[in-house]
């Protein structure tokens, strides 16, 4: 596996994986069914050796009988003002139209679930949560997408309460009793979901959809209990390689276009670990931990586990190149659909080429709210 580094901007190097930390499972086993009651993600790894049970937090915020925020809509058919709309042959949600650049149709839901599986494979213990957390706690997933992470956590911890929020109401209605979804919900708008009440808040793949990271981190900090943790998972999509196989390729040019277009919308997809850590510190977080994992674009590496990660990431990135490009390129550059598809087809072809030793970087952060006991 690529070496996990805790040092900012240290070069990613190759290292042999621990064979006991994973079991081989081919991509052909992936099930993209929409029920999501049981994904193929591995069990959650709890970092602490022993996690004592805790009573629900006492706070002044109103909750419904499930421990969720009172007055917040559960999953339901959206009213007319939230109807979906078509653009470039894809379906987008109408709530806060144009804020989020990605579609929400069946194809996109499959893509998000592929990334969910990829993250469990790439993080060598195949865990969903790395930060310390109580098994019967309150977990909040921001931008939950299909809800698969929240559902898996709810299955793992039946005595916990898990909530997911998202702009698009695409989560399944048949979720575990200890899991609730609130959508449409814009986590960048002012919100109160029980300040000082959550044991862990999770955010995955937020780059490209967030306008102000500092304000978001401050709001997350207010909602965590003292001593509780925030965990964030992001991908830096800038193509990298340790040789010259990327020189002059459309893959690099495509990313520069994508970077510029999303910067122009004030929601950049480019990820900076240095800025992320600085924003977390300025928001008031402590004990910030940063890990990096390399994601090969295709199985060019000889190592068996590297090839497994690469197969999953190749599937994920091949479903992402056009999806990430459609709205930014058409809305900002005013390119027509044929031009976008011509460019993205060439990029996908290069992503499949084993002679091109490209990779992206997966970034994982854990940050603690000061105070409270240590788990």
Curated annotation (Swiss-Prot):
Which EC number applies?
2.1.1.-
Amino acid composition bias (Polar residues), ranges on this chain: 15-26
What does the UniProt entry say about where the protein is found?
A: Nucleus
Q: Which InterPro entries match?
A: SAM-dependent_MTases_sf (IPR029063)
Q: Name one GO biological process term.
A: sporulation resulting in formation of a cellular spore
Among the GO molecular function terms of this UniProt record, one is:
methyltransferase activity
Q: What GO terms fall under cellular component here?
A: nucleus
Region annotation (Disordered) ranges:
15-37, 50-75
Q: Which domain of life is it from?
A: Eukaryota
Q: Which UniProt keywords apply?
A: Methyltransferase, Nucleus, S-adenosyl-L-methionine, Sporulation, Transcription, Transcription regulation, Transferase
Q: What class of enzyme is it?
A: transferase
The family line of this record is: Belongs to the methyltransferase superfamily. LaeA methyltransferase family.
According to the record's subunit comment, the protein's assembly and interactions are: Component of the heterotrimeric velvet complex composed of laeA, veA and velB; VeA acting as a bridging protein between laeA and velB.
From the Swiss-Prot or TrEMBL record, give the protein name: Secondary metabolism regulator laeA
């Amino acid at each position: 596996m690529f070496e996990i580094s805790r040092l900012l901007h240290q070069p990613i190097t190759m290292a042999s994986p621990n064979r006991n930390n994973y079991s081989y499972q081919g991509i052909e086993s992936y099930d993209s069914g929409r029920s999501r009651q049981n994904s193929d993600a591995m069990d959650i790894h709890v970092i602490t050796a022993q996690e004592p049970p805790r009573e629900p937090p006492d706070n002044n915020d109103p909750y419904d009988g499930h421990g969720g925020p009172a007055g917040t809509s559960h999953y339901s058919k959206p009213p007319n003002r939230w109807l979906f709309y078509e653009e470039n042959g894809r379906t987008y949600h109408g709530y806060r139209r144009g804020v989020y650049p990605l579609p929400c149709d069946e194809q996109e839901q499959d893509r998000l679930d592929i990334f969910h599986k990829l993250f469990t494979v790439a993080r060598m213990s195949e865990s969903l949560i790395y930060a310390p957390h109580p098994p019967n706690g309150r977990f909040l997933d921001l931008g939950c997408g299909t809800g698969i992470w929240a559902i898996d956590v709810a299955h793992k911890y039946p005595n916990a309460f898990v909530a997911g929020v998202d702009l698009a109401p695409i989560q399944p209605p048949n979720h575990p009793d200890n899991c609730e979804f609130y959508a449409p919900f814009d986590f960048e708008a002012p919100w109160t979901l029980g300040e000082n009440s959550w044991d862990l808040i999770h955010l995955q793949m937020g780059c490209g959809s967030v306008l102000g990271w500092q304000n978001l981190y401050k709001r997350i900090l207010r909602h965590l209990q003292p001593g509780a943790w925030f965990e964030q998972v992001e991908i830096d999509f800038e193509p990298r390689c340790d040789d010259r196989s990327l020189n002059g390729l459309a893959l690099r040019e495509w990313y520069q276009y994508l970077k510029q277009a999303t910067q122009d919308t004030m929601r950049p997809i480019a990820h900076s670990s240095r800025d992320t850590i600085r924003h977390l510190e300025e928001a008031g977080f402590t004990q910030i931990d940063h890990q990096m994992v390399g994601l090969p674009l295709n199985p060019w590496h000889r190592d068996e586990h590297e090839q497994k990660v690469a197969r999953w990431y190749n599937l994920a990135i091949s479903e992402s190149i056009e999806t990430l490009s459609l709205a930014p390129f058409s809305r900002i550059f005013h390119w027509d659909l044929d031009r976008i598809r011509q460019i993205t087809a060439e990029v996908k072809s290069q992503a499949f080429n084993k002679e091109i030793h490209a990779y992206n970087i997966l970034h994982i952060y854990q940050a603690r709210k000061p105070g409270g006991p240590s788990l």
